[in-house]
């Protein structure tokens, strides 16, 4: 049976690079949030500096995810699916903005629970160096990234079982490691959790 794997972590941790490499290794469909659909494009405009109420942005993310989940379900009929960000990003980032967890959970009730979540950790200063060449989004400030990092660990260590992945979480620290080293570490950890994932 095909698996749904999600990559999460703060900005600059190496999620996109590693998610693409793992997707390629597993012959999986690579996908991401926000998506490149109409709603996802609106979200990207807001993240780049357009003004919007935080609850409106949360609802847009949830709406984009409804479309995303439909596509994920279709793709899972044919192959594994690897996503760069998913509902956990919404939970962490939106709670950091002061939105209630109950509100976030309610509007994301439609979200499919993944089989496995890979959380990439990184030293904050190294993450900022990696992001220097990028256009800054509203969440890419060191104080916010520190809060986001704490949020991920709080979520993993909480008693809350909502959206708890079937095979749990894998945590890999990417600080001072090469792309190849991180890839090997992630792949070995995935195989440990799901031995039959590579046929």
From Swiss-Prot:
Identify the keywords attached in UniProt to this record, alphabetized: ATP-binding, Kinase, Nucleotide biosynthesis, Nucleotide-binding, Transferase
A single GO cellular-component term on record: cytoplasm
Query: Coiled coil where?
Result: none
One of the entry's Gene Ontology molecular-function terms is: dTMP kinase activity
Note the CDD domains from the entry. TMPK
Transferase in keyword set? yes
Reactions accelerated catalytically: dTMP + ATP = dTDP + ADP
Reading the lineage from the top rank, the first entry is Archaea
Binding residues annotated for ATP, in chain numbering: 9-16
EC number(s): the record gives 2.7.4.9
Q: Name one GO biological process term.
A: dUDP biosynthetic process
Q: Which InterPro entries match?
A: P-loop_NTPase (IPR027417), Thymidylate_kin-like_dom (IPR039430), Thymidylate_kinase (IPR018094)
Similarity remark: Belongs to the thymidylate kinase family.
**What is this protein's record name?**
Probable thymidylate kinase
Q: Say which species the protein is native to.
A: Methanococcus maripaludis (strain C5 / ATCC BAA-1333)
The gene is tmk
